[in-house]
Amino acid sequence: MSLPTSLWDKCLGYLRDEIPPQQYNTWIRPLHAIESKQNGLLLLAPNRFVLDWINERFLNRITELLDELSDTPPQIRLQIGSRSTEMPTKNSHEPSHRKAAAPPAGTTISHTQANINSNFTFDSFVEGKSNQLARAAATQVAENPGQAYNPLFIYGGVGLGKTHLMHAVGNAILRKDSSKKVLYLHSERFVADMIKALQHNAMNEFKRFYRSLNALLIDDIQFFAGKDRSQEEFFHTFNALLDGQQQIILTCDRYPKEINGLEERLQSRFGWGLTVAIEPPELETRVAILMSKAEQLKVHLPHEVAFFIAKHIQSNVRELEGALKRVIANAHFTGQSITVDFTREALKDLLTLQARLITIENIQKTVAEYYKIKVADLLAKRRNRSVARPRQMAMALAKELTNHSLPEIGDAFGGRDHTTVLHACRKVKELLATSLDILEDYKNLMRILSG
């Protein structure tokens, strides 16, 4: 391994600790490093979107790290490309740049046949920090299907808006040209269609249909894991569509390289375009989602009620909207106005359940009681070890046991920066491997919080 690429590997280790996992997977992980002339370092980005983002957000930090790691740091260059050893050949179905061949003639697929939900549009999608990158990428794909970011791979937890964005792209494509053949489906439907085709000796028709599409939108791609024949068929469908410059969008609950039971060649192809994450929405976005949904339902929702619901329902958009619909239904059936007190009563069983879930607040309380200090000590600026170590433990537990982002955890600990949280998590991880006392404390606290 050359010196520049060896330094890059060390740099990646620091970046992995400093950057939230979803950001690292989206922006840093797709980069390839190769040694260039005169001991320089060439970083290859898979597309313009990643290259621009690295230039704007991460290049300064990468340069700083390389300066710290070497007395003679390599000169960095950024460009679009991939390592020649990993460049797909024509035989491996690299997406070609020739003019796309017209799909076979056939009946136009309607919105209904395409399984596209006309209510899921970009206009009805509430944008926030947690999803703005995914929305921006989806918008680009909708404007230039088959050209910008193909495939587009969106990953994140349940109920965060992945499917909404997928439908929004489908709606936009069909609105521009209703003759386009667009299909949205769950990955299990693809498997079921293939099995049915095998049973009826109709694989040629199956292949002809799927490979004639202008846009294929597949949800929950992780369900292909362990299904070898389905993966084989999807592999060839994927290649055929990309060769014809037809758009593919995939969603998953995890980063593609983390899907156990998925062939490496598929994982590799999923990274040919752009991979973006959607994270749980922050408080302001949750409030905006509730206000937008209430407006769609033509219901007046006081802002303080939206704030109350958003503060207590933090997991995902689906549960947030479910809570709102319950409040609206109760108000409709009882004829009462929607107030904070009414909402608290309407959601009392849900709020009781939420209260039993692990929150940053009860982590702080549990850690403070365990170490016999005050919660206020965890939030204060004091740095003596008797307080600093419990604070680091509490931050690490909050990252492990809640869905909160690093900035949100930092805010909950006296307005600290997210890098402080990262340092705390790294320190606790290090101590767990070297200190039996810290390991015992960690196990005890996990048992208390999980029990």
Swiss-Prot record:
Q: One Pfam family name from the record?
A: DnaA_N
Give the gene name: dnaA
Q: What is known of its domains?
A: Domain I is involved in oligomerization and binding regulators, domain II is flexibile and of varying length in different bacteria, domain III forms the AAA+ region, while domain IV binds dsDNA.
Q: What does this protein do?
A: Plays an essential role in the initiation and regulation of chromosomal replication. ATP-DnaA binds to the origin of replication (oriC) to initiate formation of the DNA replication initiation complex once per cell cycle. Binds the DnaA box (a 9 base pair repeat at the origin) and separates the double-stranded (ds)DNA. Forms a right-handed helical filament on oriC DNA; dsDNA binds to the exterior of the filament while single-stranded (ss)DNA is stabiized in the filament's interior.
Query: In its UniProt entry, what is this protein called?
Result: Chromosomal replication initiator protein DnaA
Give an example GO molecular function: DNA replication origin binding
The entry's family comment says: Belongs to the DnaA family.
Segments carrying the region annotation (Disordered) are 81-106
Positions of region (Domain III, AAA+ region) = 115-331
Q: Which HAMAP family match?
A: DnaA_bact (MF_00377)
Show the segment(s) annotated as Domain II: 72-114
Classification via NCBIfam families: DnaA (TIGR00362)
Alphabetical GO biological process terms: DNA replication; DNA replication initiation; regulation of DNA replication
Q: Which intervals of the chain are annotated as region Domain I, interacts with DnaA modulators?
A: 1-72
Q: Where is the signal peptide?
A: none
Q: Where is this region: Domain IV, binds dsDNA?
A: 332-451
Xref: SMART domains: AAA (SM00382), Bac_DnaA_C (SM00760)
Q: Which residues bind ATP?
A: G159, G161, K162, T163
List where Polar residues composition bias occurs.
81-90
